[in-house]
Amino acid sequence: MSDNKKQQALELALKQIEKQFGKGSIMKLGDGADHSIEAIPSGSIALDIALGIGGYPRGRIIEVYGPESSGKTTLTLHAMASAQKQGGTVAFIDAEHALDPNYAKALGVDIDNLVLSQPDTGEQALDIAEALIKSGSIDMIVIDSVAALVPEAEIAGDMSANHVGLQARMMSQAMRKMSGVISKSNVVAIFINQIREKVGVMFGNPETTPGGRALKFFSSVRLEIRRAEAIKQGSEMIGIKSNVKVVKSKVAPPLKTASIDIMYGTGISRSGEVLDLSVELNLVNKSGAWYNIGEEKLGQGRDNAKQYLEDKPELLNELEKKVRTHFKLTK
């Protein structure tokens, strides 16, 4: 078969697969993202770029997972604040009973208008989530976390009783019921998940996420967030650098990574993201340890350059605007 005929046959096969399994079920890694999909910005410029469509896709299920203290909740709080800034209504299902209102407020969440539920059981949490989504009144719902969605039978049962597979069955049923409703209501549904170790795995990756396989399958986007290093000021630890990898995406080519600075008390560092992306686009020159724009020196070392931008909000805004224009991102 000639190269031309092979290409035609491949295009035909791709069209048939998309027709049968839906748009985004198959794509070439070099293909552009589907920009017709409406998205809510994630609150991180670097992550919006990695996601390919400028944020979290509406009408889809998103899974954010990672080890403890890697920044999962911070990432979702920024997304919630972003949805509210666009005039949207946000619901937070706090199955872990661990939401810190003061921290949420510091990250820009309007806690007075946040719809909050702290359910007693997993079934109750998912029923409340389904009812809110069906109402068509919310734009984003966050479930924190899948690991904390404990089935009622497990709570009511004896501590020594065997409850293998209960949570997986509960999640599987919930995903089947909710996926269609989420799509019709155009809501962004974010499930936060933890990482567990599989017992007895000798080869391959021993890590897995709780809740069975249903969430993996039904998610249009899966984000893995991992802590890379500590950010220190002298001997004091003031934040962490985390890497967010787009492990799965049905709306854009996956496997892209965003590196973000999470500062304690204030969340994702806007100046850090703008600085790194400005260097990448040659808007800021980096020579050795020095950062400069033409004759204007921003500072020696990344931390000093970040501080310079924070002290000059006009310059920071100007650079951010240029970065957003280049990557076709909305505010």
Swiss-Prot record:
GO terms for molecular function: ATP binding; ATP hydrolysis activity; ATP-dependent DNA damage sensor activity; damaged DNA binding; single-stranded DNA binding. SUPFAM superfamilies: P-loop containing nucleoside triphosphate hydrolases, RecA protein, C-terminal domain. One of its GO terms (cellular component) is cytosol. The keyword Transcription regulation does not apply. ATP binds at G66, P67, E68, S69, S70, G71, K72, T73. PANTHER family: MITOCHONDRIAL DNA REPAIR PROTEIN RECA HOMOLOG-RELATED, RECA. This is Protein RecA.
